[in-house]
Amino acid sequence: MGKKIKKEVEPPPKDVFDPITIESKKAATVVLMLKSPEEDILAKACEAIYKFALKGEENKATLLELGAVEPLTKLLTHEDKTVRRNAMMIFGILASNSDVKKLLRELEVMNSVIAQLSPEEEVVIHEFASLCLANMSVEYTGKVQIFEHGGLEPLIRLLSSSDPDVKKNSIECIYNLVQDFQCRTTLQELNAIPPILELLRSEYPIIQLLALKTLGVITCDKEARTMLKENQGLDHLTKILETKELNDLHVEALSVIANCLEDMDTMVLMQQTGSLKKVLSFAESSTIPDIQKNAAKAIAKAAYDPENRKVFHEQEVEKCLVTLLGSDSDGTKIAASQAISALCENLSCKEFFNTQGIPQIVQLLRSDNEEVREAAALALANLTTSSPANANAAAEADAIDPLINILSSKRDGAIANAATVLTNMATQEPLRAIIQNHEIMHALLGPLHSTNTLVQSTAALTVAATACDVEARTQLRNCGGLVPLVGLLHSKNDEVRRHASWAVMVCAGDEPMAVELCRLGALNILEEINRSLSRKNKFSEAAYNKLLNNNLSLKYSQTGYLSSSNIISDGFYDYGRINPGTKLLSLKELCLQELNDQRAILLVNNKSDTSPPPSMEDKSSDVGYGRSISSSSSLRRGSKEKANAIFGSPTEEKSEPASVRNTILSRAFTKEKGVSKKKSRLQLICSSYLLWKGKGKKEEEKVKEEEEILALPKFTEGSPEKEWNPPPDPEFCVYVLEVTKSILPIVNLKEQIEVLAKYVADKMGGKIPKEKLADFSWELHISELKFQLKSNVVPIGYIKKGIFYHRALLFKALADKIGVGCSLVRGEYSRGWNEVKLVNEARKGMIGNLPPPEEYIVDLMFHPGNLLKLRSKEADLYRFL
């Protein structure tokens, strides 16, 4: 045998690195290993980083600071499955950190992550890729990237995965994505509802819960509800409700059912299958507040459909809701109240709550929870709308007091609802009186000052409903409510402006309120509104006319016209023509002005501090106007004697100096100017006057005159606190008495007008021929009256030489007193006239449609008593120069 030769060991290649085992305890070292070209090292480094990231948020932040994210993103596309899997596991954990999510969006790794969802990949990769997407989908920008890169379809496919973690992550991501409408639409196109319904059979509650939440979102769309119904989704939901062990899913299941009940077809189907009855019974018997609340919400959502309301009524849903009102949960009370509000659109439902439900709702008005009070007030508002019976039931349940308390609530919705209920109640007079006794006007002061348009609108409407009598309007004025009410007329909101106009129209129902509203600028605002085609409304026009019709002095000054329905009352004054928007001073302000050379202000006042003596009544009782001038003159002399005894004659020439006479007269006429004078001062003046007047007279005559002077009205001695009254006009009082006794009994209207015209002409200077009109010195007479009265205001009865507009005003004032309809028109150049309507005597008694009455102008100047047909030549000559 030959000798064995020993083989020589070959040395290792020079370019091969000797293996080295490294143990590192620093994350930074491992992060550096992510750049290694060796697959084994990459896999081990990723595994170590995964374990490190699992330990907490601080470690995730550390990895981000060490720059681990960017090299890891490159490993998502590595050829080695282990490296790729381990890198994906890291991102599944790291993506819960908000800073990491932000960086991942910037690095645009979404395509790489979604690619890991392909069927060829391992289940572990599916798990962590879906987990990464679930974390990324929490933020809106992440949702957009997932959707735009086609992530929805593979996620839906993974719902059928055998791994529960994959299912859980996928349905969670889908739930986040479907918050966006576009994703919901795409989900339906991808037929995602069947696999989602299948998840309801899962043995894992979290998967079932996420599936129900997803269905609760997507069934907000009608198409999704249809697909759910076609795939027997309602059966799945009903079974969940019937299973007590799944009580943690009942709330979400009811939310899905609530959406489905919005469809009439679904409602009918549930009614036919008995599912609806089961749902209502379940809600009524449940002791879980959230279940009761969601059941009530389901009813409320479905009840907005008219057909659904009918079905609910057939299922006696009202009883269920009344039971829910007694829940201990405020949320359930709110939801039940809202459901009742929706059901009230159905008349049968509204009638049911008349006997049951309203007392329970009224109790909720006293709740400490303001949201409960708001919901209860909403239910009561809908229950009482167009339902006097329910309004009475609410009042009987003592709802008025808590409703008025709610008007001071901090929640605008509660205030608006409470105001609506009070408005509905106030349509009935007995309830309105009760509401007024609770100081409703003072309670509305806060809502009228609100900046919320809904509160403003309802508050103004409540004012319109409750300010129907003088006491309520006075209460509103005294508490300062007119100022904010007028301010609401400036609103840019159409409903606020309309309701404010309505309230102003109601408040202008009496003259003092109309005058006050005009003083606050309501008339000017309404005039401006009515000039705008876009802002005006029927109520603004009606309010404007109502203000003028109850403030005739302003109306006549602005428009120069009073219709036959505009009845002149005591205190009316003719200031003369003013331009629209110009402020008209009050009568008191005009009376207190210094004497000026402007046009005299004519006053109509039948109220007097003194009354005609009994002898006057006796004398005038047998006097019919038109018998003789002497009879009329005797009456006039009697009235003059009375007036002279008090004021001094304004027309007769006196032998005493004018200064003494005018001093006494002015103090008797304008009580404001003599308020501060003491009685001793007045007696001193009167005594001086009597001493001067009594020279050469007998002692008994002096005593008589002294008694007459001391019989002056006592307003010269009044205190400053005494209420101001317009200057009295005893002459006009006599006129009213005379025409009432002599002209009112006349049966024929035309004869009444003619006799009254002659009477007025006689009191104002008699017949004036046209050719002597220029010689009729009425201006001097008026100036003398102003000087004697020391006032710019002249009572109409004092005028004995009157021109057209004086006579027309006196005719209108007297005609209104005896019920003779006539209008008053202001012309140019001191012209004024009255228009009357008369039926043609020849057509009286004829059968069939009668022609309209003819209009005439009453001649008070040239031929007193003549009736001039309107628009005739004679009438035009009377009206115009």
Curated annotation (Swiss-Prot):
Gene3D superfamilies: Leucine-rich Repeat Variant. Keywords: Autophagy, Differentiation, Lipoprotein, Palmitate, Repeat, Spermatogenesis. It holds the Pfam family EDR1_CTR1_ARMC3_pept. Palmitoylation is important for its function in autophagy. Disruption phenotype: Mice have normal viability but show complete male infertility. Autophagic degradation of cytosolic ribosomes is blocked in ARMC3-deficient spermatids, which causes low energy levels of mitochondria and motionless sperm flagella. InterPro entries: ARM-like, ARM-type_fold, Armadillo, Armadillo-Ser/Thr_Kinase, EDR1/CTR1/ARMC3-like_pept-like. Changing residue 518 to A: Reduced level of palmitoylation and inability to rescue the autophagic flux in ARMC3-deficient embryonic fibrobalsts. SMART domains: ARM. Residues 622-636 have a biased composition (Low complexity). ARM repeats lie at residues 15-54, 57-96, 98-138, 140-179, 181-220, 222-262, 264-304, 306-345, 346-385, 388-427, 429-468, 470-509. A lipid is attached at residues 507, 518 (S-palmitoyl cysteine). Residues 605-659 are annotated as: Disordered. GO terms for biological process: flagellated sperm motility; ribophagy; spermatid development. Testis-specific. Homodimer. Interacts with PIK3C3, PIK3R4 and BECN1. Interacts (via ARM domains) with ATG14. Essential for male fertility and sperm motility. During spermatogenesis, promotes the autophagic degradation of excessive ribosomes, providing energy resources for mitochondria and thus ensuring sperm flagellar motility. This is Armadillo repeat-containing protein 3. It comes from Mus musculus (Mouse).
